[in-house]
């Protein structure tokens, strides 16, 4: 014979919950006395306090082994990569000459990007250095901080400087300037005491034909040794990366051209197929004209 359990009324359930929360007979709150709750809270306070202290101690010990100026491990950044400006999502530089809005965003980005290179700012913050040699600033047992940086003046970019330029870096006339910059790598040396230079070309034969002529600023795409080595963001507070500007003069209109630019230096490998940005950068250039 099945014995049916008597169903509690709503009032009984409420009373049981009220008694669980606070039992006036035993003076228990949610099943525990005040003393029991005090011991529980004290235990967790000590437990989590100990964990926090252990975490803080281990972090402090670890930070004593790390320099705040130079990363401890840099082997993954042995070869600097190249990037272009104006910065676009897919490295596509598309210009519709007759459509101002299509290239005005590029012009605004370049204005902002080149602002730190203004000659007046460079003269105020950085040094005039001797070209053709590394600008080394060793500590010699005493922290040499901050490091000084060499001037890279905007006027060195010639017709791509954008100074008093009614063509807006050439974008309004279909002769755009694209800027090549080398990513910063701490304590990087070009090797063989020879200046580096950037070269650009079409990736395929048809790209080379459609690319046409171009000029580089500084001349021959040179990057002088005096801008190296780089000592890090905290050491080299006012460091400005050297740039190479490429002005494309007569790209075949309405055709997508694949361009690849490489940095040429004694110890930079540009043929690593696993890293498409090691010492090189590829981008697409299209000049639309109606």
Curated annotation (Swiss-Prot):
GO terms for molecular function: ATPase activator activity; ATPase binding; protein-macromolecule adaptor activity; transporter activator activity. It is a single-pass type II membrane protein. Glycans are attached at residues 96, 118, 153, 159, 193, 197, 238. It comes from the Eukaryota. Disulfide bonds join 129-150, 160-177, 200-261. GO terms for biological process: cell-substrate adhesion; intracellular potassium ion homeostasis; intracellular sodium ion homeostasis; lateral ventricle development; membrane repolarization; motor behavior; negative regulation of glial cell migration; neuronal-glial interaction involved in hindbrain glial-mediated radial cell migration. It is found in: Cell membrane. Residues 1-39 are cytoplasmic. The chain crosses the membrane at residues 40-67. Pfam families: Na_K-ATPase. Its main location: membrane. GO terms for cellular component: apical plasma membrane; astrocyte end-foot; cell body membrane; cell projection membrane; cytoplasm; external side of plasma membrane; lateral plasma membrane; neuron to neuron synapse. Residues 68-290 are extracellular. Belongs to the X(+)/potassium ATPases subunit beta family. This is the non-catalytic component of the active enzyme, which catalyzes the hydrolysis of ATP coupled with the exchange of Na(+) and K(+) ions across the plasma membrane. The exact function of the beta-2 subunit is not known. Mediates cell adhesion of neurons and astrocytes, and promotes neurite outgrowth. NCBIfam families: Na_K_ATPase_bet. PANTHER family: SODIUM/POTASSIUM-DEPENDENT ATPASE BETA SUBUNIT, SODIUM_POTASSIUM-TRANSPORTING ATPASE SUBUNIT BETA-2. The sodium/potassium-transporting ATPase is composed of a catalytic alpha subunit, an auxiliary non-catalytic beta subunit and an additional regulatory subunit. Interacts with BSG. This is Sodium/potassium-transporting ATPase subunit beta-2.
């Amino acid at each position: 014979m099945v014995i049916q359990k008597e169903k509690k009324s709503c009032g009984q359930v409420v009373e049981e919950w009220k008694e669980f929360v606070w039992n006036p007979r035993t003076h228990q709150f949610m099943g525990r006395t005040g003393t029991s709750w005090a011991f529980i809270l004290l235990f967790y306070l000590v437990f989590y306090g100990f964990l926090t202290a252990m975490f803080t101690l281990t972090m402090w010990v670890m930070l004593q082994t790390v320099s705040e100026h130079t990363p401890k491990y840099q082997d993954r950044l042995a070869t600097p990569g190249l990037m272009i400006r104006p910065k676009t999502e897919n490295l596509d530089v598309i210009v519709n000459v007759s459509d101002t809005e299509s290239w005005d965003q590029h012009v605004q980005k370049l204005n902002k990007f080149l602002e730190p290179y203004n000659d007046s700012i460079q003269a105020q913050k950085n040094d005039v250095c001797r070209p053709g040699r590394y600008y080394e600033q060793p500590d010699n047992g005493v922290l040499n901080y901050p490091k000084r940086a060499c001037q890279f003046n905007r006027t060195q970019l010639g017709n791509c400087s954008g100074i008093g330029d009614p063509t807006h870096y050439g974008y309004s006339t279909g002769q755009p300037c694209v800027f090549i910059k080398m990513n910063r790598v701490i304590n990087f040396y070009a090797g063989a005491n020879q200046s580096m230079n950037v070269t650009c070309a079409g990736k395929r034969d048809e790209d080379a034909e459609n690319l046409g002529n171009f000029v580089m600023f500084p001349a021959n795409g040179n990057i002088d040794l005096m801008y190296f080595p780089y000592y890090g963001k905290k050491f080299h507070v006012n460091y400005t990366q050297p740039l190479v500007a490429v002005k494309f003069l007569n790209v075949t209109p309405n055709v997508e051209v694949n361009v690849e630019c490489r940095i040429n230096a004694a110890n930079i490998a540009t043929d690593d197929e696993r890293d498409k940005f090691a010492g090189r950068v590829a981008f697409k250039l299209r000049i639309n004209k109606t």
